[in-house]
Amino acid sequence: GIDTPELKQTCLKEGAKVSCGVTAKKILIDKIGNNNVKCISEGKDQYKRTLAECFVNNESLSSYLVRSGYGFAYRRYSKKFIPDEDYAKTNKIGMWSMDFDYPWDYRRAL
């Protein structure tokens, strides 16, 4: 699975605050556009929430967000999105071009 920044989460780019959570939402909305989204259920988590991977035009939205630098591979649950994260990190794409807290660290600090 993946994790994404919280809507209120900000990052720092060259000393300026950037709304990285809002940007993550925007690039996902832009990617989906008016296309149909197909989700494949992968079961439930410990809190009984549905886990699913969603696709638009046969492209994984999870992979897209991670490769765009606005999603992070949940390494303890899956290795699937690590190559996408490595690509974004190596190329300093999205949040990897900024100073940021991982979403799980951001939530813990709230």
Identify what each model region corresponds to.
Residues G1-Y70:
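Electropositive
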